[in-house]
Amino acid sequence: MENNNVPKHLYFYSVGLSYKKADAEVRGQFSLDAVAKTRLLEQAKNDGIESLLVTSTCNRTEIYGFAEHPFQLIKLICDNSNGSVDAFQKVGFVYKNQEAINHMFRVGTGLDSQILGDFEIISQIKTSFTHSKSMGLANAFMERLVNAVIQASKRIKTETEISSGATSVSFASVQYILKNVEDISNKNILLFGTGKIGRNTCENLVKHTKNEHITLINRTKDKAEKLAGKLNLIVKDYSELHLELQKADVVVVATGAQNPTVDKAILNLKKPLLILDLSIPKNVNENVEELEGVTLIHMDYLSQLTDETLENRKLHIPAAEAIIEEIKEEFVTWMKGRKFAPTINALKEKLNAIKASELDFQSKKIADFNEEQAEIISNRIIQKITTHFANHLKDDDTMVDESIEWIEKVFKIKAS
């Protein structure tokens, strides 16, 4: 039988860094693309780690997993990114056991998002869990926890208004353009990159600017054509990027490249240019600001743009937290039961062995011994004894580890 219990010397950790302490440049150093994530999971498996989940988005890179010491997980991030241990120590965080559980709930439900109520992260957690599970790195604890977080996220989304109103990086970028670029409907807009943020930005641009001069460029042209077809936009080849940059009044860069793809060397400008870099790592070299007429805005600045919508969202935090507490309590109850279940089962086996021995002895000693009745009575007594122990271990005031150790010592049993 598979043993899903966490060995006592292992702890559940969440380690990583986020927008709270790490700026865009540092987050870029620690970002992990799909290949790096797979490599990290393979390394974890080779290191003997039994369960692990890794997420890497524009705003955070995090690992959730079991280890004897958090450095095992920190090393995995540093080994598979461009970040260093020294840099991590300055901006990173480490949460252990219940704090790590609390953190995943807050992240997955949008309460820890750079823009409050942004539920995009939950889809990342789902995808990351599926990836881990496919590689044999998701135990019962992790699966139950992720499902609990997904449940909390769904309930908060449907039962509160914490995600109401249009507030996202893509929406904020369009609002910035509308406020800072005159006659936007007649300007040339270039969108470079058609990932999730790029697509959302493009849809918002079409909706709010009424502009018919939006050009899309993507390294993979068919992705750009697919999006352009829906929105009736222009698509150009990646090889024409430098030419389109010259024509543009506004450029939105939302690529997933690991290094800058736009710098001053490819800009031959004859008019002012507004560049919005919505990428992590940054995909626009800051040297473009050395050119006259260029304004460079990064997503971190856009994320700080708060409005009435965001203030309204804050009113719904208590309701969201109440839902989290309810679901978290259910998870903790399950976790406690899972922790002591092997000990209770071992105790029941021990008592059954004592019963069998005693019934055998008495059946030989007593002439008219009624074994069937004795079996029924004994089983009821064993059930009552084990139930009493289980109820004690479920009690919030019980020190579970110490109680389990005491039970195993007194009855000379070993949970398997």
Swiss-Prot record:
Its EC number is 1.2.1.70. It holds the Pfam family GlutR_N. One of its GO terms (molecular function) is glutamyl-tRNA reductase activity. It catalyses: (S)-4-amino-5-oxopentanoate + tRNA(Glu) + NADP(+) = L-glutamyl-tRNA(Glu) + NADPH + H(+). InterPro entries: 4pyrrol_synth_GluRdtase, 4pyrrol_synth_GluRdtase_dimer, 4pyrrol_synth_GluRdtase_N, GluRdtase_CS, GluRdtase_dimer_dom_sf, GluRdtase_N_sf, NAD(P)-bd_dom_sf, Shikm_DH/Glu-tRNA_Rdtase. Substrate binds at residues 57-60, 113, 118-120, 124. It is an enzyme of class 1 (oxidoreductase). Keywords: NADP, Oxidoreductase, Porphyrin biosynthesis. The active site is at 58 (nucleophile). The record marks 103 as: Important for activity. NADP(+) binds at residues 193-198. GO terms for biological process: protoporphyrinogen IX biosynthetic process from glutamate. Pathway: Porphyrin-containing compound metabolism; protoporphyrin-IX biosynthesis; 5-aminolevulinate from L-glutamyl-tRNA(Glu): step 1/2. Belongs to the glutamyl-tRNA reductase family. Catalyzes the NADPH-dependent reduction of glutamyl-tRNA(Glu) to glutamate 1-semialdehyde (GSA). Possesses an unusual extended V-shaped dimeric structure with each monomer consisting of three distinct domains arranged along a curved 'spinal' alpha-helix. The N-terminal catalytic domain specifically recognizes the glutamate moiety of the substrate. The second domain is the NADPH-binding domain, and the third C-terminal domain is responsible for dimerization. During catalysis, the active site Cys acts as a nucleophile attacking the alpha-carbonyl group of tRNA-bound glutamate with the formation of a thioester intermediate between enzyme and glutamate, and the concomitant release of tRNA(Glu). The thioester intermediate is finally reduced by direct hydride transfer from NADPH, to form the product GSA. Homodimer. This is Glutamyl-tRNA reductase 1.
